Amino acid sequence: MDGLNTGEEEDSAFTSISLTDDTDHSLKSLHSGAERLFPKMMNADMDAVDAENQVELEEKTRLINQVLELQHTLEDLSARVDAVKEENLKLKSENQVLGQYIENLMSASSVFQTTDTKSKRK
């Protein structure tokens, strides 16, 4: 019996190795780890793309608002130019009327007329 006991002691000293195919189990655990990792990476990538799109959208919105503001400013300036042109034409017309009036007054006044009598006195 000593031989049997010795054999049992020797067997317990060795590590038992399973002869079943463990590659399936290790691949499954690797695959499940990758499944957990990829969605996180995809979510992070999607978040980065979403943030990038959000920044781009905000920039486009800001530029559109700026363009609209500039268009309104241009319309206001154009209206002001038209008003100034009208006022200028009105003032030119009034100046012509006043110029003609002054010319008529000067020709009717004896102060501004040259007389032959003054030149004859000398």
From Swiss-Prot:
It comes from the Eukaryota. The keyword Cytoplasm applies. Residues 43-101 form a coiled coil. Residues 1-26 are annotated as: Disordered. Keywords: Coiled coil, Cytoplasm, Golgi apparatus, Membrane. Its main location: Golgi. It is found in: Golgi apparatus membrane; Golgi apparatus, trans-Golgi network; Cytoplasm, Cytosol. GO terms for cellular component: cytosol; endosome; Golgi membrane; trans-Golgi network. InterPro entries: SCOC. The keyword Thylakoid does not apply. It is a peripheral membrane protein. GO terms for biological process: positive regulation of macroautophagy; regulation of protein complex stability. Belongs to the SCOC family. Homodimer. Interacts with ARL1, ARL2 and ARL3. Directly interacts with FEZ1 and UVRAG. The interaction with UVRAG is reduced by amino acid starvation, but the complex is stabilized in the presence of FEZ1. Interacts with NRBF2. Positive regulator of amino acid starvation-induced autophagy. PANTHER family: SHORT COILED COIL PROTEIN (PTHR21614), SHORT COILED-COIL PROTEIN (PTHR21614:SF1). This is Short coiled-coil protein. It comes from Rattus norvegicus (Rat).
